[in-house]
């Protein structure tokens, strides 16, 4: 067994494990950690606990520190910078005449990289755009093309149930959803009834799948 904490970097983002060392870290704390992207500010969603060794990707990186007041202030400043970066990138996309839709801008905590998330129908040659952005921000630039489900997860919204979208609220990862699940639950197969804001089958169809499968088994038993 390995002692870990679970950390998220975005709302309903994937949970990553880190070594808590001897620090007293609890759920809701903010921590500074090193990731493949650089130094980042994360929120603890699972306090110190043990998990099976095969659930941990080695080497398990240690927490650098529990975020202090200065760290929290810097993170807030980064959020403001992201708004400006988004605006500038959108202007540059128009300037270069690229058929891409900008979704979000994100600074790493140490400002060593700015990531821009976008959607597009096909592949985009954004090499000149990257050069232009690098000359403005004087740091590393990464453009990442995402799908419609990821776009909805980032932006959020309200589902047809009247509640905040599952993918933006609590789902860490997308799960496979099939039309078979809607059929087993006797739902209307009208696309407008079983599709989410993203236009894909609603993630919540998966929530009751197991219950319906068990019910069908009991009904079919003599």
Question: Residues of each region from the PLM?
Answer:
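Acidic-enriched and Gly/Ser
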Residues: 1-188
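Residue-level detector of conserved catalytic or cofactor/ligand-binding positions
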Residues: 217-222
């Amino acid at each position: 067994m390995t002692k870990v904490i679970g950390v998220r970097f975005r709302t309903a983002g994937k949970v990553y494990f880190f070594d808590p060392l001897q620090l007293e870290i609890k759920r809701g704390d903010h921590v500074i950690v090193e990731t493949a992207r650089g130094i980042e500010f994360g929120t603890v969603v699972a306090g110190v606990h043990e998990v099976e060794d095969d659930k941990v990707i080695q080497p398990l990186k240690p927490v650098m520190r529990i975020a202090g007041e200065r760290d929290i202030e810097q993170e807030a400043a980064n959020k403001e910078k992201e708004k400006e970066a988004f605006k500038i990138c959108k202007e540059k996309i128009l300037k270069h005449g690229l058929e891409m839709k900008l979704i979000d801008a994100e600074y790493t905590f140490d400002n060593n990289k700015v990531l821009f998330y976008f959607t597009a129908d096909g592949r985009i040659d954004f090499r000149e755009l990257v050069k232009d952005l690098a000359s403005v921000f004087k740091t590393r630039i990464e453009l990442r093309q995402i799908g419609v489900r990821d776009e909805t997860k980032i932006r959020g919204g309200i589902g047809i149930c009247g509640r905040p979208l599952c993918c933006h609220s609590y789902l860490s990862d997308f799960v496979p959803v099939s039309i078979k699940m809607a059929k087993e639950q006797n739902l209307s197969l009208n696309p407008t009834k079983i599709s989410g804001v993203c236009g894909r089958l609603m993630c919540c169809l998966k929530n009751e799948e197991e219950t319906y499968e068990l019910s069908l088994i009991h009904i079919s038993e003599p």
